[in-house]
Amino acid sequence: MAASRPLSRFWEWGKNIVCVGRNYADHVREMRSAVLSEPVLFLKPSTAYAPEGSPILMPAYTRNLHHELELGVVMGKRCRAVPEAAAMDYVGGYALCLDMTARDVQDECKKKGLPWTLAKSFTASCPVSAFVPKEKIPDPHKLKLWLKVNGELRQEGETSSMIFSIPYIISYVSKIITLEEGDIILTGTPKGVGPVKENDEIEAGIHGLVSMTFKVEKPEY
C-alpha cells in the first residue's frame, strides 16, 4: 500500500486540508482583523487540490478572487492529540500552497456570521507545488516565501513571522481533528494578498527550494 501511495503525491490521496487563518500579524492588520489567542481553522475538501500543470478555476459567483500564499505542512503519519514537543516527529514534508479566496463572498459570510465554505472551499482553490521532503528543510520557520502575478511581486514574507508556530499548530489541530498520513496543514499567509482575474499568471516560490506557476481560468460549466 505504501508503494502505491507515495507521500510525494499527497494531493492524489490525502484526505484533509486544514487551513489556519490570521497567523501573520501583517496580514491580520491588512485585513483589519483581530489577533486571536488561538488559531482560526477551516477546511477545504480534497477536490480543492490543483497540482502544478492544472489551472486555478475562478468560481462564477465571485468578482474578487484573491491569492493567499502559504507554507503547507504534509503529515507523514497519523497523529491524535500530540504534545507540542513531539509534533515535528509527525511531519513528512512540505509544499508551497495557495489558499484561493473569493474575497467578496467571504466578506458577505463574515457579515452574516456564516462559515467560509463558499469563499474558500471551491474546486481548485488549493494549488500546490511539488513535495519538499522534511530533510530539505531543517527549520521551517526560516523560509522566505514570494508570489508574483504577471511578473509583479505581490507577496513576500518570512515564516519566522508566524504568530503560532508549526509545532503548536500541529498539536492544536490534532486535539480537534485526527490527522492522517498525507493530510496537509496550510499555516497562514503573509501580507500582500490581492485580486487575480481570468488569464492571469501566478508564480510563487520558497526561496532556494521550490517554485510553481499557475494560470487562472473560468470553468466551462
UniProtKB/Swiss-Prot annotation:
<protein>
    <recommendedName>
        <fullName>Oxaloacetate tautomerase FAHD1, mitochondrial</fullName>
        <ecNumber>5.3.2.2</ecNumber>
        <ecNumber>3.7.1.5</ecNumber>
        <ecNumber>4.1.1.112</ecNumber>
    </recommendedName>
</protein>
<dbReference type="GO" id="GO:0047621">
    <property type="term" value="F:acylpyruvate hydrolase activity"/>
</dbReference>
<comment type="function">
    <text>Tautomerase that converts enol-oxaloacetate, a strong inhibitor of succinate dehydrogenase, to the physiological keto form of oxaloacetate. It is thereby required to maximize aerobic respiration efficiency by preventing succinate dehydrogenase inhibition. Also acts as a weak oxaloacetate decarboxylase (ODx), catalyzing the decarboxylation of oxaloacetate (OAA) to pyruvate and CO(2), and as such is likely a regulatory enzyme in the TCA cycle. Also displays acylpyruvase activity, being able to hydrolyze acetylpyruvate and fumarylpyruvate in vitro.</text>
</comment>
<keyword id="KW-0007">Acetylation</keyword>
<dbReference type="GO" id="GO:0050163">
    <property type="term" value="F:oxaloacetate tautomerase activity"/>
</dbReference>
<dbReference type="InterPro" id="IPR036663">
    <property type="entry name" value="Fumarylacetoacetase_C_sf"/>
</dbReference>
<comment type="subunit">
    <text>Homodimer.</text>
</comment>
<dbReference type="GO" id="GO:0046872">
    <property type="term" value="F:metal ion binding"/>
</dbReference>
<feature type="binding site">
    <location>
        <position position="99"/>
    </location>
    <ligand>
        <name>Mg(2+)</name>
    </ligand>
</feature>
<keyword id="KW-0809">Transit peptide</keyword>
<keyword id="KW-0413">Isomerase</keyword>
<keyword id="KW-0496">Mitochondrion</keyword>
<dbReference type="InterPro" id="IPR011234">
    <property type="entry name" value="Fumarylacetoacetase-like_C"/>
</dbReference>
<dbReference type="GO" id="GO:0034545">
    <property type="term" value="F:fumarylpyruvate hydrolase activity"/>
</dbReference>
<dbReference type="Pfam" id="PF01557">
    <property type="entry name" value="FAA_hydrolase"/>
</dbReference>
<feature type="binding site">
    <location>
        <position position="68"/>
    </location>
    <ligand>
        <name>Mg(2+)</name>
    </ligand>
</feature>
<feature type="modified residue" description="N6-succinyllysine">
    <location>
        <position position="112"/>
    </location>
</feature>
<feature type="modified residue" description="N6-acetyllysine">
    <location>
        <position position="110"/>
    </location>
</feature>
<keyword id="KW-0464">Manganese</keyword>
<feature type="binding site">
    <location>
        <position position="120"/>
    </location>
    <ligand>
        <name>oxalate</name>
    </ligand>
</feature>
<feature type="binding site">
    <location>
        <position position="22"/>
    </location>
    <ligand>
        <name>oxalate</name>
    </ligand>
</feature>
<feature type="binding site">
    <location>
        <position position="70"/>
    </location>
    <ligand>
        <name>Mg(2+)</name>
    </ligand>
</feature>
<keyword id="KW-0597">Phosphoprotein</keyword>
<dbReference type="GO" id="GO:0008948">
    <property type="term" value="F:oxaloacetate decarboxylase activity"/>
</dbReference>
<dbReference type="GO" id="GO:0005654">
    <property type="term" value="C:nucleoplasm"/>
</dbReference>
<keyword id="KW-0378">Hydrolase</keyword>
<comment type="similarity">
    <text>Belongs to the FAH family.</text>
</comment>
<keyword id="KW-0963">Cytoplasm</keyword>
<keyword id="KW-0479">Metal-binding</keyword>
<feature type="modified residue" description="Phosphoserine">
    <location>
        <position position="37"/>
    </location>
</feature>
<feature type="binding site">
    <location>
        <position position="189"/>
    </location>
    <ligand>
        <name>oxalate</name>
    </ligand>
</feature>
<dbReference type="GO" id="GO:0005739">
    <property type="term" value="C:mitochondrion"/>
</dbReference>
<feature type="transit peptide" description="Mitochondrion">
    <location>
        <begin position="1"/>
        <end position="24"/>
    </location>
</feature>
<dbReference type="GO" id="GO:0005829">
    <property type="term" value="C:cytosol"/>
</dbReference>
<dbReference type="GO" id="GO:0006107">
    <property type="term" value="P:oxaloacetate metabolic process"/>
</dbReference>
<dbReference type="GO" id="GO:0018773">
    <property type="term" value="F:acetylpyruvate hydrolase activity"/>
</dbReference>
<keyword id="KW-0456">Lyase</keyword>
<dbReference type="GO" id="GO:0006090">
    <property type="term" value="P:pyruvate metabolic process"/>
</dbReference>
<dbReference type="GO" id="GO:0005759">
    <property type="term" value="C:mitochondrial matrix"/>
</dbReference>
<keyword id="KW-0460">Magnesium</keyword>
